[in-house]
Amino acid sequence: MQKRNILGIFVGLIIGLYTVLGMSLFTFINLKFNSVYYAQHIPHKEGTDPDVIMLMENMGWAYTPEIEDISYDDDGMYAITRNKGTKTSILGLSGDTLYFSSASGDDYLLNRNFSVQHAFDEHYHKIKYNQRKVQKEIRETVQPVIDAQPKPLINLQWLFNLIYQSRFN
């Protein structure tokens, strides 16, 4: 009788452990795959653009649809390239730095809070820049990808907000 009770407790603990691990894995994957959708709906202060940041940070997880004139690079540095006629703009992420090459040929280095740290022209001379204009150009580059993000089957917006609220405010 004693062995049966111990075996029952052991089996119950194993089943409980697998259930908790499975739910944790599902939650992690859900938050990664749907991070761009959740970031679109999180309250944030002006100028932070959490949807663009989440798209770049989780590009390996997020939905990246085939869209005309947009290509993706995910080997080494995550990047999104958008061709508009003869003009090309590129937004890339390497480590903690966002890199944006505008269609006009100017290059910008941004931190993960989406603020410009350095700006250069095509000859690598420092240039003056307008933060809002740069952010608008970046948004134009990636907006079709952001618009294509599907709604999650199980919405964990509350958990995403809990985790990322302090970062985007």
Model-derived segments and spans:
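Extracytoplasmic electrostatic interaction patches
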Residues: G60-N169
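Sec-dependent N-terminal signal peptides
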Residues: L7-I15
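Positively charged n-region of N-terminal signal peptides that target proteins for export
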Residues: M1-R4
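N-terminal export/targeting and maturation segments
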Residues: I14-T97
